[in-house]
Regions:
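Glycine-rich loop(s) and the adjacent beta-strand/alpha-helix scaffold that form part
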Residues: 260-263, 267-343
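Beta1/beta-strand and adjacent pyrophosphate-binding region of the FAD-binding site
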Residues: 73-87
Length: 482
């Protein structure tokens, strides 16, 4: 029989919401350097402790740099609204504000608009109506998620997001279509409470750009912003916020530096400053403070910040906006730790973002969980397994067995209109994966155990026990849904 394997190492991407950046202008203060050895480059687990200064916990990134002197500012830009960041959040803000009559300046440390990923959710949209997809009822799902978070969430924001999602998505659909983009529906899981679809952008039709077409969407927004007269400035990095009355009044502007020569620009906002500049996953000290569980995955070495990067599993941006907010007295969210964007492996799953729902074993050759979960959930449990590795094991008749249970096979990123995969297509895909090392194939459990470095005798016992439970129709070990 053909046994195939996937390496289900949980891959971690960006953490929490955020901004851009590395060390602020003028370098770190002596106090900051003394506060944390992480300022010298690498951070390790022994550094991940709170530093107490003036009776409060402080990390070095919480300590503000010296203000940029007025005589070093070579240019001043004034407008109604200043938007910091040229991604989806920044450009949707700029376009929406300009449509309502505001004069807007958007500046970004990147050299062009940039975004990544995809999978845009809305409860309903004109595209869904065109395809006959029923609106999503979030109540069971939202309640489940809130309970899982011990209700440490802002319910007003959650429900506002739901209630206004249709209007917002239709707005974006119009902008995308105006620029020549197609808006298609991407399949998601059907076995859990979440929505089983998401909106994606494409220039190819079907699934060619599903989950990667967000760059096309942000470029469409840039074109719309230009038509509306938004002033757009690239290669300019935010350094410090300007807050009146000794950090007790309103935020009135931003000090930024030009990437080309380091000269300083003051952006003055008559109405508001909007921070929309990315995440903080490339500041390892911030990860240690707010999202420590991902540090072993992304590594402890402090990486260089590339504002033009599309994706990087070891961290993207450096949290400049969050730092600037902290320096002028902004509050951090109370829910802790911050939610990382993590994803387990999809090998052997019939769901687009599912996990292999058959037998899973860890490096100790033990079955370690109920397998009927989504890939993101599986990655959390993998973090507690030896080596952060697990193996899904199945036989060549597994595709047909799933079909016999009334399910269908869909892979990640498939357009809603595409037909399900056939067993022959799946086996061919897995065989191709064997050639690249993504899967392992064996005729016996002994051979499989040898390839994977598992205990052959224990693997036979685990498989026998799993088959016994399958025959009973009841998972007496982990109570998985049969």
């Amino acid at each position: 029989r053909d046994f195939l394997k996937f390496g289900a190492v949980g891959a971690a991407g960006a953490a929490a919401a955020g901004i851009v950046g590395c060390t602020p202008s003028g370098g770190a203060t002596d106090e900051a350097k003394a506060a944390s050895p992480a300022m010298d480059g690498a951070i390790n687990s022994s550094d991940a402790v709170l530093k107490l200064t003036d009776g409060m916990p402080k990390w070095s990134f919480m300590i503000p740099p010296e203000p940029v002197p007025d005589d070093q500012i070579t240019e001043t830009v004034e407008n109604d609204i200043i938007v910091v960041g040229g991604g989806m959040s920044g450009f949707t803000t700029a376009v929406s504000a300009a449509e309502q009559g505001a004069k807007v300046t958007l500046f970004s440390a990147a050299s062009a608009p940039i975004s990544r990923g995809g999978s845009n959710y809305a409860k309903n949209s004109k595209v869904m109506e065109e395809l006959g997809i029923e609106p999503f009822d979030p109540v069971p799902f939202y309640y489940h998620e809130m309970r899982a978070a011990s209700f440490a969430v802002d319910q007003q924001k959650w429900m506002r997001g739901y209630n206004e999602s249709e209007e917002a998505m239709n707005w974006m659909i119009d902008i995308a279509r105006e620029s020549g983009l197609q808006v298609i529906m991407e399949r998601d899981n059907t076995f859990d409470l979440g929505p089983n679809y998401a909106h994606a952008f494409s220039t190819e039709g079907n699934s060619a750009m599903v989950s990667t077409g967000q760059q096309g969407a942000v470029e469409a927004l840039e074109a719309k912003a230009q038509k509306l007269g938004v002033e757009i400035i690239y290669d300019t990095k935010a350094e410090q916020l300007i807050r009146e009355d000794d950090n007790k009044g309103r935020v009135t502007g931003v000090i930024a530096s030009k990437m080309a020569d380091g000269s300083y620009v003051k952006f003055v906002a008559k109405q508001a400053v909007v921070l929309a500049t990315g995440d903080f996953s490339n500041d390892k000290e911030m990860l240690a403070a707010y999202c420590p569980m991902v540090l072993p995955l992304v590594g402890y070495e402090q990486g260089e910040i590339d504002y033009n990067t599309s994706f990087n599993l070891t961290g993207i941006y450096g949290g400049d906006g969050q730092k600037m907010g902290l320096w002028v007295g902004a509050a951090w969210q109370h829910a802790y730790p911050n939610a990382p964007m993590m994803q387990g492996a999809w090998g052997g799953s019939h769901e687009p973002c599912g996990f292999h729902m058959g037998l899973n074993v860890n490096m100790n050759t033990e079955r370690y969980q109920r397998e009927d979960i989504s890939a993101p959930y599986s990655s959390n449990h993998l973090l507690s397994q030896p080596g952060n590795v697990a193996y899904g094991i199945w036989t060549a008749n597994y595709p047909q067995a799933i079909l016999d249970k009334g399910h269908e096979w869909y892979s990640f990123g498939m357009d809603y209109t595409l037909p399900p995969l056939t067993p022959d297509e799946l086996v061919a895909m897995w065989d191709a994966g064997v050639e690249t090392g993504a899967y392992f194939k064996a005729d016996t459990l002994d051979d499989l155990a040898k390839q994977l470095g598992l205990d052959a005798a224990k693997l036979k016992e685990v498989v026998a026990r799993y088959n016994e439970l399958c025959d009973k129709g009841v998972d007496e070990d982990f109570y998985k849904n049969p």
